[in-house]
A protein has these predicted regions:
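Alpha-helical segments flanking ligand/cofactor-binding loops in enzyme cores
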Residues: 54, 158, 178-181, 204, ...
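Short, solvent-exposed loop/turn and secondary-structure capping segments
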Residues: 18-23, 75-77, 318-319
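Active-site gating loops and adjacent loop-to-helix segments of metal-dependent hydrolytic enzymes
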Residues: 19-46, 87, 102, 107-110, ...
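Active-site environment of divalent metal-dependent phosphoester hydrolases
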Residues: 15-18, 48, 71-74, 174-178, ...
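Metal-associated gating/positioning segment near the N- to mid-region
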Residues: 2-68
Length: 330
């Protein structure tokens, strides 16, 4: 006996770009020299030989988003990849699949506190986002009018403005979540909220938003003020309100291979079991715009399949076999 599931998916990680067991040598997550770097591409920093990757596969995780970090207001281009291969170009499912934005403490600390420059406040962070998106709109209009121009940072934002890919907003505190939503509405952006630590406080304000809330990581002590109050209960509260929720480890903040355990903890704290399974399969696939090929077992989709010895939320369960693209992997 056992359980067969689609390969598990985490919609927000830094695997391969913030490498296991390394210091600055393997830290390629944050280009903390400029708060606006939309032309930075995660695929250019991913090391397929990160030792965390086979550990994640052995836990049944087959697909992840690899994201730039959250020191920059606009951090760069997120990639959705399969966790198998030696050449990242062959691992990519979709790149870019989203653009990384960040609100809250991280940009303020990196630039205001450490460098004495903008953004020093949440006001400045939001203003920088608006100014950059307005500039990108003007650039796009000029280009569509036939002007011969090329600016890599502005080019990166055109798919976002055309709603071809979403913005992924790093936002913990309730007011930061609402600022992200405000800006997304102003520019008619598709979007997801990453972390959503304070979302329980404003469920009535956000329950009708057409967005995926990527909740977590919820294990461990709060590392900064905006993560105080983080709870495995949040995912269940949001799904009970009818919202789409994915669960994240935010690897390497917490290990990617704990993703099934995180889902189990959410169930223990009140989340519907089926919703928790969706939160590590089809919902993160939707957040990354790759649900046509992964996230469920269906004719025509990629054969990414995991065989568990028991219920995937039982801590004694082991992974019996993992298949990626129909091939059994170790």
């Amino acid at each position: 006996g056992g359980y067969i599931l689609p390969g598990l998916i985490d919609a927000h990680t830094h695997i391969g770009i913030s490498e296991e067991g390394l210091r600055w040598e393997g830290e390629d997550c944050n280009e903390a020299t400029d708060p606006v770097t939309p032309d930075m591409r995660a695929v250019d920093g991913i090391n397929p030989f990160d030792t965390a990757i086979p550990k994640a596969r052995r836990a049944g995780i087959t697909t992840v988003a690899v994201s730039p970090g959250s020191t920059n207001v606009i951090g760069g281009q997120i990639a959705a990849i399969k966790l198998i291969g030696k050449n990242v170009d062959n691992m990519v499912i979709k790149a870019p699949c989203a653009i990384k934005f960040a609100l809250g403490e991280n940009p303020k600390r990196t630039y205001g506190d450490n460098k004495g420059r903008s953004p020093m406040t949440r006001m400045a962070t939001a203003a920088i986002m608006r100014k950059t998106l307005m500039r990108a709109q003007r650039y796009m209009n000029k280009k569509e009018a036939g002007e011969d121009i090329y600016e890599p940072d502005m080019e990166a934002l055109i798919p976002l403005l055309k709603r071809e890919i979403p913005a992924h907003f790093h936002a913990h505190r309730a007011d930061d979540i609402l600022t992200a939503i405000r800006i997304a509405h102003e520019f008619n952006l598709k979007y997801c909220i990453l972390h959503a630590t304070g979302a329980e406080k404003i469920t009535d304000c956000i329950k009708d938003e057409h967005a995926v809330f990527v909740v977590g990581p919820s294990m461990g002590p709060a590392g900064k003020p905006e993560t105080v109050g983080g709870s495995f209960a949040t995912a269940g509260v949001l799904t009970a309100a009818g919202m789409e929720v994915a669960i994240t480890t935010d690897h390497d903040v917490t290990p990617l291979w704990l993703l099934p355990s995180f889902a189990a903890m959410c169930v223990r704290e009140g989340m519907n079991e089926y919703a928790a399974l969706q939160a590590i399969t089809i919902i993160p696939a939707k957040a990354l715009g790759i649900d046509a090929c992964v996230g469920s077992i269906k004719v025509g989709k990629d054969a990414d399949i995991v065989v568990f010895t028991g219920h995937p939320f039982n801590y004694l369960t082991e992974v019996r076999a993992v298949f990626i693209n129909g091939v059994k992997v170790e």
